[in-house]
């Protein structure tokens, strides 16, 4: 099976369920095939991300609140999701003031790892400090923060760290990656070493070759905790 690029979402999908990977990245099905699907969390997360993307240069909380109001009609989710919105905006506004130079919002990257594969994705925000260090921020609206121990092995953040190090030509230990939880005003951050990233990239190459060796008929469904939220559930042979 042909594959020459890997993204965090592609890797996550493959690890969760091979059949879901087939539907999304082999058959390219983009619709929602789940009559019970609830997209509130996805829509709300996209809404908050868009506020943060467009609001980094705003100088007052009122401007940020007005931006949120202007964007709201573009997203469909239950009004109950908005109960913490004022707190989220206040926390982000104060957090944002403390940050140094924003190099990029929604940074699209594609970085060659070897001659035959690359990694690609979109990073919420990249900050450059006066010392020349970089901070990669991934905004999160999930209820509970990811423990730092899990962040140390998070494939998404490892890819982001490698991409920023390559893009801006700095050592990997000059890049800090972090989840920011605006409802908690909590930043969970880690910094990776060269050896750790090298081990991860070797594992990623092995995963790519695993996928390359598979035929479409090898991609089987896996019943797990994500099934009820899967956009392809009604197509799945397990249901």
Map each language-model feature to its residues.
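Mg2+/Mn2+-dependent nuclease catalytic core
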Residues: 107-206
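Short amphipathic alpha-helical segments and their helix-coil junctions
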Residues: 1-3, 20-34, 67-72, 136-142, ...
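Accessory terminal regions of nucleic-acid processing enzymes
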Residues: 131, 205-239
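A non-catalytic, helix-rich entry segment at domain boundaries
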Residues: 43-108, 112
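A residue-level signal for conserved active-site and pocket-lining positions in enzyme catalytic cores
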Residues: 17, 48-49, 125, 160, ...
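Surface-exposed helix-capping loop/turn segments at secondary-structure junctions
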Residues: 57-63, 166-173, 211-222
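Nuclease catalytic cores
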Residues: 4, 8-60, 85-86, 104-107
């Amino acid at each position: 099976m042909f594959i020459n690029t890997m993204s965090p979402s592609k890797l996550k999908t493959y690890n969760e369920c091979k059949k879901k990977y087939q539907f999304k990245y082999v058959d390219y099905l983009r619709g929602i095939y789940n009559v019970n699907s609830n997209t509130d969390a996805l829509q709300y997360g996209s809404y908050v991300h868009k506020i943060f993307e467009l609001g980094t240069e705003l100088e007052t909380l009122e401007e940020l609140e007005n931006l949120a109001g202007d964007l709201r009609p573009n997203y469909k989710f239950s009004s109950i999701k908005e109960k913490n919105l004022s707190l989220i905006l206040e926390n982000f506004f104060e957090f944002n003031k403390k940050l140094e130079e924003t190099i990029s919002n929604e940074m699209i990257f594609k970085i060659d790892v070897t001659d035959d594969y690359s990694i690609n994705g979109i990073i919420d925000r990249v900050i450059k400090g006066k010392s020349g260090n970089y901070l990669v921020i991934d905004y999160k609206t999930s209820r509970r923060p990811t423990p730092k121990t899990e962040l140390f092995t998070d494939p998404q953040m490892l890819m982001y760290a490698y991409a920023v190090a390559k893009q801006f030509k700095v050592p990997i230990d000059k890049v800090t990656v972090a989840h920011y939880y605006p409802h908690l005003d909590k930043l969970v951050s880690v910094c990776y070493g060269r050896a750790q990233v090298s081990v991860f990239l070797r594992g990623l190459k092995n995963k790519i070759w695993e996928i390359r060796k598979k035929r479409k008929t090898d991609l089987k469904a896996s019943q797990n905790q994500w099934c009820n939220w899967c956009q392809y559930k009604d197509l799945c042979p397990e249901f």
